[in-house]
Regions:
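Short, well-ordered secondary-structure micro-motifs
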Residues: 37-40, 73-75, 138
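Mid-sequence helix-capping/hinge segment at a functional interface
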Residues: 1-38
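Short, solvent-exposed loop/helix junctions and linker helices
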Residues: 40, 91, 159-161
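Alpha-helical elements of Rossmann-like donor-binding domains used by nucleotide-donor carbohydrate transfer enzymes
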Residues: 15, 45-48, 74, 96, ...
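Donor-binding and catalytic core of enzymes assembling or modifying cell-surface/extracellular glycoconjugates
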Residues: 45-132
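A generic structural signal for short coil/turn motifs at secondary-structure boundaries
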Residues: 35-39, 154-157
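A short acidic, often aromatic-flanked loop/helix-cap motif at beta-alpha or helix-coil junctions
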Residues: 8-10, 88-93, 151-156
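Nucleotide-sugar donor-binding patch of glycosyltransferase catalytic domains
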Residues: 116-170
């Protein structure tokens, strides 16, 4: 799908530019909406990866709902300089998440709803899959790189995917 970002209301695009005014951002979407399938990659893996990208001069941006304070505080304590844009605004909307994602150089995500919002922006993205079907659920564009534990490690366990597997694709 080639979504035209200019269709987003200007208030969302303007807010995204205020929250993420520069470049060199790499986004992380780490939480799943449903819990009946184990499709979350270890938060420690995301933290390790975020710290590695900081060493490359990039800024990690975590897309985590603002009410998930325990997780946000854990990441803040272990990833200096990480940004949490959903804490910065009162507007809560898929349109704003999509506008924010358009400010990223790259996104790394598990299979979740935010991944689909990011996918609308046509930015490079690495998507990690475990038990879910990557052929069915991955965004469809040439900028998407898929790491599917079933294909790589013959396992439904997303945590068989290593930080190094992801880092190679950045």
């Amino acid at each position: 799908i080639n979504y035209d970002l200019s269709c987003l209301p200007n208030k969302f695009l303007d807010e995204a530019k205020k929250i993420l005014p520069n470049k060199n951002y790499i986004g992380f979407s780490v939480t799943q909406g449903n819990f009946y399938r184990k499709k979350s990659w270890s938060i420690q893996n995301f933290i390790k990866l975020a710290n590695k990208i900081i060493l490359k001069g990039k800024v990690p941006v975590f897309f985590i709902e603002k009410d998930n304070l325990i997780l946000i505080n854990k990441i803040k304590s272990e990833v200096p300089g990480a940004l949490f844009p959903e804490q910065e605004f009162n507007l809560s909307s898929p349109a704003l998440v999509t506008a924010l994602a358009s400010r990223l150089d790259l996104a790394i995500s598990i299979d979740n709803g935010v991944m689909h919002m990011i996918g609308l922006t046509n930015i490079p993205m690495i998507v990690l899959f475990g038990p879910t079907n990557s052929k069915k659920f991955a965004p469809k564009n040439n900028l998407i790189k898929i790491l599917d534990s079933k294909n790589i490690y013959n396992s439904n366990d997303i945590n068989t995917i290593t930080v190094e597997d992801v880092e190679k694709l950045i």
